[in-house]
Amino acid sequence: MAVERKFIAEGARKARVEKYLTKELKRAGFGGMDIARTPLGTQVTIFAEKPGIVIGKGGKLVHQLTQDLAQNYGVESPQIEVQQVQNPSFNAQIMAERLANALERGWYFRKAGSSIMRRVMDSGALGCEVVIAGKLTGARARTQKFTEGYIKHCGEPSNTIVEKGYAIAIKKLGVIGVQVKIVPADAKMPDHFAIIEQEKKLPAPKTTVTAVIETDNEEPALPDENIDEEV
């Protein structure tokens, strides 16, 4: 059971770190993170829409994040690397945060959800799903779903090719949860394959071979009549 508990503890710590970074880097457009163990310590890669805000003036903010990860979350020798998100429309976490901010500013949930989905699909995504749950229009909580394109919900493709993001919008009536799933344009589908047609070979031209056979069976020459008469 020691091995199982170790994996559970690692997963719980990663969830706490991600929650902390989401809260601290909300203005920077936090788009997710990745943690990997290296011989020199722990490599923490932060994906953000605005890397300059993550680094801070003179590297002050990134230094503070490094100290917090080491002291409060038990990350061994953290080394933070910041990477800019090239296409924010394909980052599910960034789009979920934008949708939550739109709901907090008073956007109607149908308009906000369809606007986010349309922006993702116009960027060339293969599929997008937006789920908004909470007290949307009345006292009762309900769920509204917007879907377009191709989305996998189970199996290995749902974990490998589907980008997932989650955010919370705090309103007067209560909390509204937002979930965004995106299948990027460069995702490789498991059922997509190409059939390579074999090149048709032209038939070889027919050649006619004419054989000339020489034989020794020649007709004997007839005797000359003049010779017989002279004799």
UniProtKB/Swiss-Prot annotation:
Q: Which InterPro entries match?
A: KH_dom, KH_dom-like_a/b, KH_dom_type_2, KH_sf_prok-type, Ribosomal_S3_C_sf, Ribosomal_uS3_arc, Ribosomal_uS3_C, Ribosomal_uS3_euk/arc
Entry GO terms, CC = cytosolic small ribosomal subunit
Listed GO molecular functions?
Answer: rRNA binding; structural constituent of ribosome
Pfam families per UniProt: KH_2, Ribosomal_S3_C
Q: Which residues form the KH type-2 domain?
A: 17-86
UniProt record, GO biological process: translation
Subunit record text: Part of the 30S ribosomal subunit.
Its job: Binds the lower part of the 30S subunit head.
Xref: HAMAP family: Ribosomal_uS3_A
Recorded family membership: Belongs to the universal ribosomal protein uS3 family.
NCBIfam families, A to Z: PRK04191.1, uS3_euk_arch
Q: What is this protein called?
A: Small ribosomal subunit protein uS3
What is this organism's lineage? Archaea, Methanobacteriati, Methanobacteriota, Stenosarchaea group, Methanomicrobia
